[in-house]
Swiss-Prot record:
It comes from Chlorobium luteolum (strain DSM 273 / BCRC 81028 / 2530) (Pelodictyon luteolum). Transmembrane segments: none annotated. GO terms for cellular component: aminoacyl-tRNA synthetase multienzyme complex; cytoplasm. It catalyses: tRNA(Pro) + L-proline + ATP = L-prolyl-tRNA(Pro) + AMP + diphosphate. One of its GO terms (molecular function) is proline-tRNA ligase activity. It is an enzyme of class 6 (ligase). This is Proline--tRNA ligase. InterPro entries: aa-tRNA-synt_IIb, aa-tRNA-synth_II, aa-tRNA-synth_II/BPL/LPL, Anticodon-bd, Anticodon-bd_dom_sf, Pro-tRNA-ligase_IIa, Pro-tRNA-ligase_IIa_arc-type, Pro-tRNA_ligase_II_C. Belongs to the class-II aminoacyl-tRNA synthetase family. ProS type 3 subfamily. Homodimer. Gene3D superfamilies: Anticodon-binding domain, Bira Bifunctional Protein, Domain 2, C-terminal domain of ProRS.
Length: 481
């Protein structure tokens, strides 16, 4: 029930944990750093998977599956990659009761094991491109964990593609980061900033990393997806060459891209409130709960509720009836608000006499009278569509209201405690690191969106807020998850 949840303005971190556990989305495991994704949470992941998988296939990708274990010799082939991931790796040293001749790494990501296969599959330009996605689990030995946001084991998808030219691979990188952007905005109702990472923030072994960054309700940033241009680094590490159209030998050009169950954490923190989960309808496996008010002729009320659910389901709206009598209607209202069911419909004997029912939106708690009968599915769909749109607009307005421009370091330090800060940066890793050390804020993204660039004049030269040196552009700073 909602009274288990700490208020956001009292303790935001505790609010998040309380909500995740009270709404039965996930729980702690007896295995250190790991979580149990409960059915309510996994249902959200399934909706995300279904939408993303369709989008991947529409852009020409196919699914495959590669081993969980990676030989140590494979990991060591890409020096920058192993340097980036070694501290987070789990390593298998024994199997079948004996010490292994070669250690096996439990995948933190799959570039190395996949490129060992690509080397066997690619001989000619005719074998390219390869556009493969994998749905899998990965392990990164995290010291400080938080449900969905940072766990030792998590679920994700990782795309790995191989191309004949650098132009093709860059097109793929941008195509996929835009797929993620579309998914975040159209399904999650979560506005994001799309752009590049700085060299110090990019993926280990990548030439460039592109990302989408979202603002949570506490003003912090959350990286919601990444797409990496790997250049020829992994092809060279695995000696993956192909014969070009003009009969030359060249190394293959590569990309990788991924999102994870971290998106569920983003969804929770972007939209939910002190009553519980607020889910955008497109990611709700159950969009409507019908609660019959069981007074008078209970059988007639239940019959009406079942007929309403059937008509909604026939129209493609997932609906269910809670006709149980062990809990009061008030208890049910609070419970389904906690679980984030987008629309609640109440119907009782008097409503049936009037030919109406009462619908309540989860996001605004606004109630409206709807006519019973054949117009009901259309009216409910209108509410769901409005809710999806309004949740995005509310989150966008919140981001805009909590994004400020800073022209001095003092302004910056005050503003970065509350949200995103747009400021000039001199382009050096030294300045970036100093700001991070002193404020815990990082450069989240160098925006690539025309609208965002124009709104905040991101390409306008100026003076670095920290060093006072000339700066060619502004960047987005924030504290982050």
């Amino acid at each position: 029930m909602a009274d288990k949840i700490t208020a956001r303005n009292e303790d935001y971190s505790q609010w998040y944990i309380d909500l995740v556990r009270s709404a039965k989305l996930a729980d702690y495991s007896d295995v250190r750093g790991c979580m149990v994704i409960r059915p309510n949470g996994y249902a959200i992941w399934e909706k995300m998977q279904a939408a993303l998988d369709r989008m991947f296939k529409e852009t020409g990708h196919v699914n495959a599956y590669f081993p969980l274990f990676i030989p140590e010799s494979f990991i060591a082939k890409e020096a920058e990659h192993i340097e980036g991931f070694a501290p987070e790796c789990a390593v298998v040293t024994h199997g079948g009761g004996e010490e292994l001749a070669e250690k096996l790494y439990v995948r933190p990501t799959s570039e190395t094991i996949i490129w060992s296969s690509y080397k066997k599959w690619i001989q000619s330009y005719r074998d390219l491109p390869i556009l493969i996605n994998q749905w899998a689990n990965v392990v990164r030995w995290e010291m400080r964990t938080r449900l969905f946001l940072r766990t030792t084991e998590f679920l994700w998808q990782e795309g790995h593609t191989a191309h004949a030219t650098p132009e093709e691979s860059q097109e793929e990188v941008m195509r996929m980061i835009n797929v993620y952007r579309t998914f975040a905005e159209e399904y999650m109702a979560m506005p994001v900033i799309m752009g590049r990472k700085t060299d110090s923030e990019k993926f280990a072994g990548a030439e460039e990393t592109y990302c989408i960054e979202a603002m949570m309700q506490d003003g912090k940033a959350l990286q919601a997806g990444t797409s990496h241009n790997l250049g020829q680094n992994f092809a060279k590490a695995f000696d993956c060459q192909f014969q070009t159209k003009d009969s030359r030998l060249d190394y293959v050009w590569a990309t990788s891209w991924g999102v994870s169950t971290r998106l569920i954490g983003a969804l929770i923190m972007a939209h939910s409130d002190d009553r519980g989960l607020v889910l955008p309808p497109k990611l709700a496996s159950r969009q409507v709960v019908i609660i019959p008010i069981l007074r008078g002729d209970k059988a007639a009320v239940l019959e009406q509720a079942d007929a309403m659910a059937a008509s909604l389901k026939a129209a493609g709206i997932p609906a269910f009836v809670d006709g149980s009598e062990q809990n009061s209607p008030g208890w049910k209202f609070a419970e389904y608000e906690l679980q984030g069911i987008p629309v609640r419909i109440e119907v009782g004997p008097r409503d049936i006499e009037k030919g109406i029912c009462i619908a309540a939106r989860r996001d605004t708690l606004e109630k409206s009278e709807l006519q019973l009968g054949e117009t009901l599915p259309g009216a409910v769909q209108e509410i769901l569509d409005a809710m999806q749109k309004d949740m995005y607009q509310k989150a966008l307005l919140f981001r805009e209201e909590n994004t400020v421009e800073a022209s001095s370091y003092e302004e910056f330090k005050a503003a970065v405690e509350k949200g995103f800060v747009i400021a000039h940066w001199d382009g050096t890793a030294e300045t970036e690191e100093k700001i991070k050390e002193e404020t815990k804020a990082t450069i989240r993204v160098l925006p690539e969106e025309d609208g965002y660039i124009e709104r905040y004049r991101m390409n306008e030269p100026g003076t670095c807020i920290y060093s006072g040196k000339p700066a060619a552009q502004k960047v987005v700073f924030a504290k982050a998850y």
